[in-house]
Every structure is written in structure tokens, then in C-alpha cells.
Amino acid sequence: MDEFQRNSNXHRXWQQLFLYPLFFREDLYAIAHDHHLDRSGSSEPTEIFFSHFFSFLTVKRSIRRIRKQNKSISLFGNSDSNKLIEYNKNFSFKSMLEGFTIVLEVSIAMTSKHFIKGMDGWNSLRSIHCIFPFMEDKLPHSNYISDIRVPYSIHPEILVRIFRRWIRDVPSLHLLRLILHEWKNSFSQENLEKVLITQRGNTRFSLFLWNSYVYECESFLIPLIKRFFNPQSLLYGSFPDRTHFEKKIKDIVIFPLQKISPKXIWLLKDSFIHYVRYGERSLIALKGTHLQVKKCRYHLFHFWQYYFHLWFQPYRICSLELSKTSFSFLGFFLNVKMRPLVVRAKMLDDLFITDLITNELNPIAPIRSILFSLAKEKFCDISGWPISKLSWTSLSDDDILDRFDRIWINLFHYYSGSINQDGLYHIKYILLLSCAKTLACKHKSTIRVVREQLGSELFTNSFSKEREFISSSFSKTRSQRERIWNSEISQRNPLXXFWQKMENKQIEN
């Protein structure tokens, strides 16, 4: 790859005009085959056996089909009943997509610096918990929030139009169009979301398509919203018609008109906007009027309708007032509530006591939803009573203890910043008893016998890690009200992801 990039930099003008011959180089598909084999072998060991049947002869035949560009013939379809041959062709299709993606990634990275570094003022964070300190700082100063679910059902021709900004090679665009149609037709409408969004269905090609699509959305959408909510400030004296201006400003200014200084008036100076996205979920927090929020929702609908030719379902945009309702994001319930503060100021011999009211973001762990997820995984019943995990009784004692330990550690670290820590320790009690019942069921004994044999070894690792995590995060001088966010968490907790899917289904219905 390094040699390929060096050659591309030396012949950059040639690279922009002639990408098409690079798609037929077998060494790129060899790199893609090794990369795909490493990924599949680590997650699904059963595929290692089938991967030995990979043959570059199948890749050459597929390349010949692409060169013919006959749309009536499926490029990567197969009609063989043999499972080994069927898997071989499917594996060849994935390897070809990997090689195709390598060429596109390198070429687009060279032609667009913003594609790698991002736009000015944007931060791309690897940890999920880095989002919450930002939200704690910004959301209390906002009064509305728009929860947006980015639509994923996009037509292949729209993707081709997106890539036309970076690819100038016409044959490459035709080849890309052919592969995109073939790739989308291989999935049903229900499975397309899993392929693009979920981590299990992600391939290098699907990730590349999703990132390109989201980048295109944000590069056009966010500047438009910023321009809409942050127009140029205008002085009062610049308006020749004072009466006409006062009639207009009643619908724009948030504070009463009587308190405005007659010398200078700033138009929409207090409005600001903040944008956060993780996966397909986007949040737009703003400070403005209800009319502005409705206009923003209107422009979002028309943006996807006219620019991407998508019918944007109404449930995909939910506008909420932060002071009245709560919303869910990344497995948390989030709301903004007022927090009273008493400030004492002493000046000479006088003591002044002032009451201040500030807004505070409260992240809440969905304990009931976590209990429902644990009940579905057979750790407890619907009422929350712990039961034995029968499917794990064939494992060794160390494996059983390690699995329960990892479940609790992941939950504790993920929801360490929530305000309802008592509910988390209730979850811990359920997992502890479920672990003891699983061991008792395996050895055909009682919970008392298991606890006498193991003693303090039940969840020993989790207790030690928990104390270490708390002691390293808190000092004696810090307030106990201060929350802990773990910067090492890079993905959602599985239980939180399951709960978020249930929430999305309820919204759609």
C-alpha cells in the first residue's frame, strides 16, 4: 500500500483521470483477501475452513464479467448448489469489494484533504464517553434539541453522484455504478440497515459507503443550519424604518421588547447551535424560539427530499423542549433540570446570600430496560428474580466466573456517569446470584455450598477493578457529585444497544 501511495503521488494527475486500470490488478485483491481472512477468522472460526477454497481464478472470471458490463448478467451471482462453491463465490465477491475499496480510499484521500482531516472546528472522538462532557457543558445553555435518525435507504445513483466530486474517470464511475447496483440488490430492505449501520454487518466497502454518505450530508447540512441560526448581527441604527423593524423583531427576539436598550439592538445574537453524531443518530441542540425549531425541521425534510431524493419519514426527526421532556441517546436517558445554588458573598462587614438557579444535564441509566435485557438473555425472570444460566453449565468454573465478571465490569464502566448508581448495584446483585445459581446447577448443589466453596472469589476481579477505577478517578478534594466518564469506551454496551433498538421500533410504530 505504501508503494501504491508513493506511485500515486508521483503520478497524481494520471491517478485522477485513470483509476479504471487499477481495479484489475490482482495484487490489490490479494491484499483484500488477506485482510478479509484476518477479520473473518477472528470473529467466526468456521469460515477458516472455507477460506482455503479461495481461488484467484474466480476473481479473474468476475473481472471478465465486469469488463463486459452486461447488466443482464449478475456479476457475482451464483446458481450452484454446492455450498463450498457458493461460499467461494461469495467470498470472492467480498474480496473484490475490499480491493475496490482500497483503490477508492487511496484516490479520495489524495484528492480531498478534508475527507481525512475533517472540516474546521469539527472534532472526531474515538470514545463514546467524550461526548457526554461536551453535552454537559453545552446542553444546559440550550432550550431545544432535535433528535435525528439519518436515513440509510439511499439509491445507488445518489452515491455515484457523491463520488463524482472526487473521481473524474468516467469508466470508473460506470464500474462503480454497476457494482453498487449489484451490491444493493444482494440485500433485502430489512438487511440493508444491518449491513450499513450495525458493527457485525460492516465490511470495508459498507463502512466506506456509509462514511462517504454521512460526510456528504454533514458537509452541506451543518453549514446551512449554522447560516440559518447565526445570521450577521445588525445594529438598530442601520434600519431606516424603526416601526417596521420593531414589528419584525417581536417574532425573533427571545426577551421582552420593553427591556431592550433604545441605543443598540442585536438581532439573533443569543442563538447558537451544537451538533453531535454517533452512528445513525444525530443531535442538534439550539437556543431559539419554537418557530425557529419548526423552520429547522422543515428545512431538514426538504434537504433530504430534494438533495438525496429520499422521503424522510416524520418519526426520524423528533424536536423536544429540554426543560419539559427527556430523550434517549447512547443507552442513557438524558434530561436538563434546574439546580438551585446558594452563594454567600462577604463584603467588609456585610454578608449577602444569593440564590442562583443553573441548568444541569442528568444522565440516567435505564434500569428497567437493562432488567428486561437480562431477562431476555436468561439471567433473571421478568420480575427481576435471578435464575441460572443453563446454557453456560457446560463451561468451566473459571469461564463462568469470567463471563459474569465481564458483564458487570462493562455495565459499571459504561454507566459510571449516571446519577442512579443504586440501580446499578441492584443489577450487580442479580448477576451475582445468577452466577452462584449457575455454578450450583452445574455441580448439582445449593447456593450456600457454592458460596462456602468459593467464598470471596465470586466477582473478585470486578470488585478489585471497581475499587481501582473509583480510586483513580476520584480524589479526596473532589466533590462526590462529580460524575465519572471512561474515555476508553469506544462502542455502545450490548444491553444498551438492544434497548435502543426497542425504542426505535416503538417510535416507528
Curated annotation (Swiss-Prot):
GO terms for biological process: mRNA processing; RNA splicing; tRNA processing. Belongs to the intron maturase 2 family. MatK subfamily. The gene is matK. Its main location: plastid. It comes from Thuja occidentalis (Northern white-cedar). InterPro entries: Domain_X, Maturase_MatK, Maturase_MatK_N. It is found in: Plastid, Chloroplast. This is Maturase K. One of its GO terms (cellular component) is chloroplast.
